[in-house]
Each structure stands twice: as C-alpha cells, then as structure tokens.
Swiss-Prot record:
Glycans are attached at residue 189. Residues 1-32, 86-102, 168-198, 272-286 are extracellular. The gene is opn4b. This is Melanopsin-B. Belongs to the G-protein coupled receptor 1 family. Opsin subfamily. One of its GO terms (biological process) is G protein-coupled receptor signaling pathway. Residues 482-499 have a biased composition (Basic and acidic residues). The keyword Hydrolase does not apply. Disulfide bonds join 100-178. One of its GO terms (molecular function) is G protein-coupled photoreceptor activity. It comes from Xenopus laevis. Photoreceptor implicated in non-image-forming responses to light. May be able to isomerize covalently bound all-trans retinal back to 11-cis retinal. InterPro entries: GPCR_opsins, GPCR_Rhodpsn, GPCR_Rhodpsn_7TM, Opsin, Retinal_BS.
C-alpha cells in the first residue's frame, strides 16, 4: 500500500491506512515499553523537582535551568506515554483529529523546550567559565528567569505553526502517536521540516559543541596559569574553584550528549523523508525513533542521581525508600570551609589598604605549640624548633591546600627562613616576626612590612602592627550564588554571627584585625583567639 497516498478528512490530512497489519504482541510490547518509560520519567522528574523544593541550597540561578528541564521532561512523559499506551492497546489512534493536534502540540512544545534549555545551560556554563566577570550580570535569578521565559516562547512559536497552516499534525508510523507531517512532499511540509531541524536541532548542536570546546580550552589554560602561582594555597583554591564549575559543566554535558543521541535517529528519519525517500520508510522505522526520542525525558533524573552529589544527598535524606539505590555522597570539605569562613569577607572586603588573601579554616598547629612550651611560657629556641618541625612537611607537600603563606623571621636571625603555615588566625599570635603585604592607595604598588617581636615579650607589637585582613573571595560564580542564598535564608543565624563579630572584631582601628586591647599575658591572648576561632 502506498504510504504517500493521502485523503482529506475535513480540514485535516491523514494517512489512508486505517489499519496496519502488525502483530498484536508487537503493539503490546511497544505500548508496555512506552508505559514503563513514561512512569520512570514522571517519577524521576518529580524526584528532581522535589529535591530542589526541599533543598534550598540547590535553588541557585544556574540550577533554574535544571528545574525547567525537569518540568518539560515531566510534562513530556505525562502527556505522551498514557495516550500512546492506550492507542497501542486499541491498535490505532483513538482520540481523533483534535486529540492528535493536542498530543502532537504537547510533544513538540516540551521537546523543543528541553533542547533550548540545554542550549541555555551550555551558554551559561560557557560564560561562567570563560568570562567570569561578565557572568555576574548574566547569572542572576531575574536574568535566568527571563531566559527561561524566552525559551518557552520560542518553543511555543514552533509548536503552534502546524496548527496555523504551516505543515500539519498527523498520526505517524504505527498510528499510536502523532507528529508533524514530514512524509508528504509539499512545500509547506518540506520548508517546516527543514527550518525545524535547523533551528531546533542542528544549529543548537553546533553552538553547544562550540561552547564546550572553548570551555575545555579555558579550563586547560587556567590550569597552566594556576601552576605558575607561588602560593600553594592559592593554587589549591583556584584549582578547586574551577573544578566545581567544570563539574557542573560535565553534568550538563552528559545530559546533552544523551539527549542528542536520543533525538538523532528521529532527525535522520525526518531528513530522509524530506529528501524525497519517504516511501522507503516503514511504519516501524518511523515509530521506533519517535519512542527513543520521547525516552529522553527519563535520562535527566538518572544522570543526576548518579553524578550530582547534592541531589543524591537530598534524595537520600528525604526519600528513605530509595536509599538502597542512591548512596549518600561524601562531604565536600572545600565547600564547607568556604561557607564556614564567608562572614570574614563581608565586613573586611571594603577596606582599601588590606591585602586580599584566599584562606580557609584549616586545622591549626597551636595545640602542638602549646604542648611544647613549658608552663605556657614562650621559649625562643624551643618554639623555633617546634615551628620548623611542624611546618617542614608543608614545604615538601605541594598538595597542602587552603594555606596562608607568610614569611616568619626572628629579629636577630641573619638568614630568615620561609615556611608555610596552616591558615589559622592563631598563627599570627606567636611571638615571631610577621611580614605582611599591603597595597599603597596612592602609588598602587605593593610593599612588604616586617613586624618584629618586642624583645620584652609584650603584646603591643600585635595590637599596633599592620596585619593583613583575611577575607574569603570565592572566584566561583556558583559559590557566590550559593552564599547569597544561604545568607538570605538564614537571617537569624546572621544576626547571631554579627553579635559574635562585634564581640571579637574591632574594625574601628584601620590596622587591627582582632580586638586585643587590655590583654596582659599570653594566656589571655590565647583565650581571645580561641573564642574567635570557635
């Protein structure tokens, strides 16, 4: 029977094949497979939306695209699978012309929305990684919401076109689903098919490939530049920051690859028909690619369940019945250290003459120092030997992350030693010379100031010294957005922290880091610093 032959039913054109001689078990198998795919897509994408609803830390601006992708995939599964399953049981399309139009319209709308959302994710990751300064204005929640609205409007335009006369929606393949008429060789159908494939599939695919190629080159270039930095701590921080951004990009890349592989067979079939070889396409060759394309709705939650640590953690905590499928990820020490130290940057970043150092709350060596000082009194020789023994491994280990590099010298030592200390604020309280780097506001040049120990053993040298303020600068855009989100959602915690800062900080003196006035002994100093760090 000629598949290209058509007849008119009112204003709609449908295939003249009323019944297709297909074994019942084949239709039942296809229908059952579609039902399973639809069920997994509905449940999986609901879990994704539930995870973003329960975990406020996931509601960052870049993740809005993931939420939009989950919504479109959920609606795709909910509108396509049940109808297709019922039609397979009846061995033909059962909802008539209006149902065919609605079914095909929904499939086109949600499918195009998913593709355009993946394109937006790729562009967003590209800007964040290659142009981090410009990404600040393009990665706000308001701007992200505007982009999502444009994605839906663009998808709606292409989905409405067949209803307005540019091509048409007809049953396809085994007549258990509907799509636009890409088989009939008319100018309207051919032009719509070509424009749809180019503007919705091929051009976005080229843009996505371009974005990820230059993202990879930027990551490699940044990695080389980081290796040239002299500070191990700065190397580690920048490397980890770029790793976080690249991790998000890799998750999106896996989703995009799977999505493209799912829709590629369908695109090939439409192009074969567009080239004038539609008669060579069998009902099976048109139905199977359509089923594979609609199955793309289930891959997003599966990929997130495997790769995304925060998603796994949220599902593991809130859905106990899925704990045997989703393992709880290990805690990210880097993220916790940055969030735990973020309040140090909020008040100190506005000071003009401070040197910005990237540090974290790493473990301190103070306990070892105090254990080796008899009766709590500082002894120059014993303290020097203890500090050298503790810090020498850090000089040999290039992987020691989140460290504060300072130059520590003794006043009378003709050959000062450079050692690398953990980034604890306790290190500045020891009776040793401390060199700090400050920036002159007039000449815009950096200079080194050496703060010597008072030979009398007093604490005035600490109070009067120009110490560098220690702030946290998260170079990662995702860290900035997550920090803003936590700051907005934890106002009570912020007020408590502010009260604590007022107790232990004294910023009315431009050159002091801690309020050390009124201290008479090293024991008092140790207690103040201990309270500050706790």
């Amino acid at each position: 029977m000629d598949l290209g032959k058509t007849v008119e039913y009112g204003t709609h054109r449908q295939d003249a094949i009323a019944q297709i001689d297909v074994p019942d078990q084949v239709l039942y198998t296809i229908g059952s497979f579609i039902l399973i795919i639809g069920s997994v897509g509905i449940i999986g994408n609901m879990l994704v939306l539930y995870a973003f609803y329960r975990n406020k830390k996931l509601r960052t601006a870049p993740n809005y695209f993931i939420i939009n992708l989950a919504i479109s995939d959920f609606l795709m599964s909910a509108t396509q699978a049940p109808v297709c399953f019922l039609s397979s049981l009846h061995r033909e399309w059962i909802l008539g012309d209006i149902g065919c139009n609605v079914y095909a319209f929904c499939g086109a709308l949600f499918g195009i929305t998913s593709m355009m959302t993946l394109l937006a994710i790729s562009i967003n990751r590209y800007i964040v990684i290659t142009k981090p300064l410009q990404s600040i204005q393009w990665s706000s929640k308001k701007r992200t919401s505007q982009i999502i609205v444009l994605v839906w409007m663009y998808s709606l335009m292409w989905s409405l076109a067949p209803l307005l006369g540019w091509s048409s929606y007809v049953p396809e393949g085994l007549r258990i689903s509907c799509t636009w008429d890409y088989v009939t060789s008319t100018m309207s159908n051919r032009s719509y098919t070509m424009m749809l494939c180019c503007c919705v599939f091929f051009i976005p695919l080229i843009v996505i490939s371009h974005c990820y190629l230059f993202m990879f080159l930027a990551i490699r270039s940044t990695g080389r530049n980081v290796q040239k930095l002299g500070s191990y701590g700065r190397q580690s921080f920048l490397s980890q920051s770029m790793k976080n951004e690249w991790k998000m990009a890799k998750i999106a890349f896996v989703i995009i690859i799977v999505f493209v592989l799912s829709w590629s067979p369908y695109a090939c079939v439409t192009l074969i028909a567009w080239a004038g070889h539609g008669k060579s396409l069998t009902p099976y060759s048109k139905t199977v690619p359509a089923v594979i394309a609609k199955a793309s709705a289930i891959y997003n939650p599966i990929i997130y369940g495997i790769i995304h640590p925060k998603y796994r953690e949220t599902i593991h905590k809130t859905v106990p019945c899925l704990r045997f499928l989703i393992r709880e990820p290990k805690k990210d020490i880097f993220e916790s250290s940055v969030r735990g130290s973020i309040y140090g940057r909020q008040s100190a970043s506005r000071k003009k003459n401070s040197f910005i150092s990237t540090v974290s709350t790493a473990e301190t060596v103070s306990s070892h120092i105090w254990d080796n000082t008899p009766n709590g009194h500082w002894d120059r020789k014993s303290l020097s030997q203890t500090m050298s023994n503790l810090c020498s491994p850090l000089l040999q280990d290039p992987n020691s992350s989140h460290t504060l590099e300072q130059t520590l010298t003794w006043p009378d030592d003709p050959s000062p030693k450079e050692i690398l200390l953990p980034s604890s604020l306790k290190s500045v309280t020891y009776p040793i010379g401390l060199e700090s780097i400050v920036k002159d506001e007039h000449t815009n040049n950096s200079c080194v100031r050496n703060h010597r120990v008072d030979k009398s053993g007093g604490l005035d040298w600490i109070i009067n010294a120009t110490l560098p303020r220690i702030v946290i600068i998260p170079t990662s855009e995702s860290n900035i957005s997550e920090t803003k989100e936590e700051h907005d959602n934890n106002s009570e915690e912020k007020s408590k922290r502010t009260e604590e800062e007022e107790d232990f900080f004294n910023f009315h003196v431009d050159t002091s880091l801690l309020n050390l006035e009124g201290l008479n002994s090293s024991t008092d100093l140790y207690e103040v610093v201990e309270r500050f760090l706790s």
